[in-house]
Amino acid sequence: FDWSCTDISKINSKFKLEKYIILFPFCSPHLHLKKWPHYNELIKLIKDELKNEYKVVIAPGPNELEEAQNFNAECILDNGKALKIPQLSSLIKKSSFVVANDTGPAHMSAHLGVKGIALFGSHTTAYKVSIEREKFKAIQVADLKKLSARKVFEKIIL
């Protein structure tokens, strides 16, 4: 999937992206059961426990710009607009780690060979969607609301 990447040096410079963890806390509007509700707690843990060594970023899609304001992470945009797919691929590829709901960017991350985890509730299984790879794993739980930020944080391997 590396073929999908493009040069994002201007975006990297603008946002001073060197070491960063990218989160995808979004999901399809009609599939809210895929959404893990503890991303802000995870962001706080990452910032506190890792002493701000890693920037925490999100990259919302075109219909997620308003929702992105609810997260205490830096929002990566291109001139105020959502990144295009090749830009998103490059942002993911250069990341230190990815944490995502079961979304398109989670599957992109798995196929780009980056380190990360996807969070699955009862809507489907990681096995059924074949998301796990050597560096990309899944956390499967019956109820995403009961999956703590601490448990997710402990799975982050940098």
What are these regions (language model features)?
Residues 25, 58-60, 141:
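Short glycine-centered, acidic/aromatic-flanked micro-motifs in structured strand/loop junctions
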